[in-house]
Curated annotation (Swiss-Prot):
It comes from Pelobacter propionicus (strain DSM 2379 / NBRC 103807 / OttBd1). Its EC number is 3.1.26.4. Belongs to the RNase HII family. Manganese or magnesium. Binds 1 divalent metal ion per monomer in the absence of substrate. May bind a second metal ion after substrate binding. Pfam families: RNase_HII (PF01351). The keyword Transcription does not apply. It comes from the Bacteria. The keyword Nucleus does not apply. This is Ribonuclease HII. It is an enzyme of class 3 (hydrolase). It is found in: Cytoplasm. Its main location: cytoplasm. HAMAP family: RNase_HII_B.
């Protein structure tokens, strides 16, 4: 591991990453789950949500918004979070669900699915973004929560690594699109592959950049 990777992995988290967790504890909550998603803006594959419950007061060094971390560091922290969390839930919104009910509702569905898996049952949810979810639990939405809350940041890492692994598997099932490299986002090589090959069974057919290449069957 290089010195830069060591600093990235083992630097102490800012004190304010526990602010929202401490606030919830002062309000009487005892089991706090952080929730985040990965893949909302991609052109293919599922949107993946994760819900994470950490032991009260635990700070895992290096945990931060997954987008700020290198792939190797995310993988290392994924293993650390999975080993130390009280519970982790993962929910999925498939491309078909996204096309049927839209990406926002599919994301909310995946988040609710992730929460339903958790044991013990949380009594407070900290959710990245501005949308609550359909579960009968107290909830607080936090804009840019993946860089402001430790438990949300942990969930962002679980969601991101889980989805990246799924896209690597989809790359083997649907070769030619480069899913393993761009993870389904709309880079130039991906757009060219869609133009050349047409959408795959795991593309989001209602998304701009994909829908233009959907061909209707002849009647």
């Amino acid at each position: 591991m290089s010195p830069m990777q060591q600093r990235e992995l083992f630097s102490s988290p800012p004190i304010d990453l526990l602010f929202f967790e401490q606030q919830a504890l002062k309000q009487g909550h005892r089991v706090i789950a952080g929730i985040d998603e990965a893949g909302r803006g991609a052109l293919c594959g599922p949107v993946v949500a994760a819900a994470v419950i950490l032991p009260t007061g635990m700070a895992i060094p290096g945990v931060d918004d997954s987008k700020k971390l290198s792939p190797r560091t995310r993988e290392q922290l994924f293993d650390e979070i999975m080993a130390r969390a009280l519970s982790v839930g993962i929910g999925i919104g498939t491309p078909q669900l996204i096309d049927r009910i839209n990406i926002l509702q599919a994301t909310r569905h995946a988040m609710a699915e992730a929460v339903d898996i958790l044991a013990p049952r949380p009594d407070m949810l900290l959710i990245d973004g501005i949308s609550t979810i359909d579960v009968p639990l107290p909830q607080k939405t936090i804009t840019k929560g993946d860089s402001r809350s430790l438990t949300i940041a942990a969930a962002s890492i679980i969601a991101k690594v889980s989805r990246d692994r799924m896209l690597t598997e989809l790359d083997l099932l649907h070769p030619g699109y480069g899913f393993a490299s761009h993870k389904g986002y709309g880079c130039a090589s991906h757009m060219e592959a869609i133009r050349r090959l047409g959408p795959s069974p795991v593309h989001r057919l209602t998304f701009r950049g994909v829908r233009e290449h959907v061909t209707c069957p002849s009647s």
